[in-house]
């Protein structure tokens, strides 16, 4: 596995642990539909939380959350629609970004709730 894939997996694992500690139930990880992949699908109370994880070894070239582009958002929305229909869910949906980045010798996590709107 390429080093950047290892880093991405590390960031996703940290994010799952982070969310669980905050009381989220993890429903799926790396859920795919067509060309879209949702990193984490979680639930907290009556909210379905769709989480895009962005991991960077440094923030020299920009914050991780800045790398979630409109095309990615469109793919996520299509995938979420399919997930909700397939699982017959009636929940509020929220899109979050978790940024994982290295600062000095340790990794930091930032959680951006309601990071973007799909309507």
Swiss-Prot record:
Xref: InterPro entries: Restrct_endonuc-II-like, tRNA_endonuc-like_dom_sf, UPF0102_YraN-like
Disulphide-bridged cysteine pairs: none
MF GO annotations: nucleic acid binding
Family statement drawn from the similarity comment of this UniProt entry: Belongs to the UPF0102 family.
PANTHER family from the UniProt entry: UPF0102 PROTEIN YRAN
UniProt name for this protein: UPF0102 protein FP2501
Species whose genome carries this gene: Flavobacterium psychrophilum (strain ATCC 49511 / DSM 21280 / CIP 103535 / JIP02/86)
């Amino acid at each position: 596995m390429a080093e950047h894939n290892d880093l991405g997996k590390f960031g996703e694992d940290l994010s799952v642990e982070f969310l669980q500690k905050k009381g989220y139930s993890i429903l799926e990880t790396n859920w795919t539909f067509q060309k879209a992949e949702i990193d984490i699908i979680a639930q907290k109370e009556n909210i379905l939380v769709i989480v895009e994880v962005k991991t960077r070894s440094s923030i020299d070239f920009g914050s991780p959350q800045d790398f979630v582009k409109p095309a990615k958002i469109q793919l996520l929305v299509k995938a979420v629609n399919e997930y909700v229909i397939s699982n017959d869910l009636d929940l509020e949906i929220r899109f979050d970004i978790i940024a994982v980045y290295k600062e000095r010798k340790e990794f930091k996590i930032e959680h951006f709730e309601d990071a973007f709107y799909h309507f």
